[in-house]
Amino acid sequence: MTKIINLFGGPGIGKSSIASGLTYKLKKKHINCDNPYEFPKVLAWDENHSAIKDQLYVLANQHRGIVKSFGKVDFIILDSPIILSLVYKSLYKGTEYPATLYGEYFDKMVLDIHNQYDNLNILLKRTEGGYNEKERYQSLDESKILDNEIENTLIKNNISYITIEVGDNTVNDIVKLLV
């Protein structure tokens, strides 16, 4: 059965780089894995500010990345786990349509989908380093706030996770958990 590796952390913490490193290391060990594209980053590069506020749209596209390789690989590595739709829905809720549409039923759907999978949830802890605002909607300070919001969302929804500090050995530390 396919295991989902969810990398959690705010923008700029290194999720995409770590996901790429994990994909490389696992494939070098002849372990089948996939690292679907990070749909919110596509929206950021396209400067599509309205679409990022539509978390149903984001969720559907992120989930499609899982569906296309589920059952075909051993691991799917996500640098934008679907649970993040709960965090960003709350961030944009009440600001404008369509974010105002998504309430508790949306939350339940996101959690139900997440819970259907065999997940390894990894919360990345930010260390000092560079931050590229060109690929983001948030500043470094806003990203640090989101780090806390993400952890609070995991705790609030009783989602178990492992905490790993981001550093030179992060990829190797995660690989050791998997193989």
Residue ranges and their predicted role:
Residues 1-4:
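Phosphate-binding P-loop
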Residues 48-97:
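Conserved nucleotide-sensing/catalytic segment adjacent to the nucleotide-binding pocket
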Residues 12:
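Walker A (P-loop) phosphate-binding loop of P-loop NTPases
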Residues 7:
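Hydrophobic anchor at the beta1->P-loop junction of P-loop NTPases
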Residues 15:
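Conserved lysine of the Walker
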Residues 37, 78-80, 124:
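Active-site flanking residues adjacent to catalytic metal/cofactor-binding acidic residues
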Residues 20-64:
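Conserved substrate/cofactor phosphate-moiety recognition/catalytic segment
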Residues 93-169:
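A glycine- and Lys/Arg-enriched "phosphate-lid" helix/loop adjacent to the NTP-binding pocket
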